[in-house]
Amino acid sequence: MKTRELQSCANRLEEFLVTMLASVGRSERRHHGSLYVQGLLLDGERKSIEPLAERLPGGNVQALQQFVGQSPWAWEPVRCLLAQHLQEELLPLAGWIIDDTGFPKQGQESVGVARQYSGTLGKVGNCQVAVGVHLTTESESMPLDWALYLPQAWTEDGERCRKAGIPEKTPFRTKIQLALELIDHLLAWKLSRQPVLADAGYGNNTEFRQGLADRQLHYVLGVESNTAVWEKPTQRVQPRPRAGRGRPRRPYYGGQPRALRDLATALPSEAWRTLTWRQGSQGPQRGRFAACRVQPAHGHVRDKPELEPVWLLMEWPSEAAAPTKYWFSNLPEGVSRRRLVRLAKLRWRVEQNYQQLKEELGLDHYEGRGWQGWHHHVTLVCLAYAFLLLERQRYKKTPIPTLPEARRCLQLVLIRMIGVCPTCHRPAVGRGSLTT
């Protein structure tokens, strides 16, 4: 970068942080918030507060700990403003992704920590789990809001909650309920409605699908192969009253539903088509897909109301012995199979999000134990991630740098802003001086 380009980028970062941190309160808080984000963007293996402060000139560990862990600024307005800003900058929008991620921990004091399943670990382990909602385009995705999952062992222990700073009388909420609350936040922030994308951990849950439909949102959600459906719309049959005494007859469904894997393998070969959903670094990404209308049969044994018909999308790789992936979607009947496939395949971006948030910006490096500190940290990490994403959008030449490459390119800009090398702490002067 030339000196003029460095200064221009530094100005953009400063303006971005001034705007995004306007709601945190007095100037001292805004200063520490800006420093914290700059520290997250700087090179360094650990992004917890102590090593982060060491890389910043005059970095005050106690001041940063107080700002992140105890300062009473509200994180919701910061996330709201960031979400509204990204909606304007990242176009065209494609969907909202719901997913959860784990934060491995030692000990039992960190808020929400428990022995629980984490997709990050791929097993049960000692960790925190957070549900996130991400905005995605065809080429980028970005976390907008977070909810920390609190197991019942936490919500039923008032003293433990008090020590961690969890708001009084916080009820137990499932990940499904947290996900729907996150969606409600986006709607309350007046974001434009987008199709909701998620894996089978959410898609297999009838409450989640119905909650999205009740909010008039479309979805493309993964489901398990053993999910039961009817191939044709089916209604409960009201039996004739029983003559004489005895228990009244219960309504019933005619016929038995089928598991998705049985339905998929019974489809004729002409039902499957090869479609390309994106151009990857290794060439076109293709797969064999079939789609048909079905009626989910969840709850039919318990006399629950019939569910509305949905699209069933299936993927069967040519080298596989059986179909491997399934999705439900309530997109209109006239939607193209290609659009279903493109939306279904966008969910993978969240995996890249989590990897970059953790490896590049220290999403899971926070060592504080409290509720407020955790939410402050993940909010500031989102600001750092968003700025990198927006800077990538400015590149006109191809190939566009990856997000890790963009962060490394930003190092000279950050040195210009802080005035010293974060490694040796010498003034940034001499060849390539950033003080001109």
Give the label of every model feature segment.
Residues 100-102, 202, 250-254, 334-368:
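Short amphipathic alpha-helical "interface-anchor" segments enriched in bulky aromatics
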Residues 361-420:
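Basic, amphipathic alpha-helical segments enriched in Lys/Arg and hydrophobic/aromatic residues
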Residues 14, 136-164, 168-172, 224, ...:
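An anionic, glycine-rich sequence signature occurring as long contiguous blocks
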Residues 2-197, 201-221, 225-228, 235, ...:
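Conserved, well-structured functional cores that handle cations and Mg-NTP chemistry
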Residues 31-35, 50, 127, 325, ...:
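Non-catalytic, well-ordered alpha-helical scaffold segments
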Residues 430-434:
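Eukaryote-biased recognition of C-terminal alpha-helical segments
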Residues 129, 349, 353, 376-382:
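Catalytic-loop motifs flanking and including active-site residues across diverse enzymes
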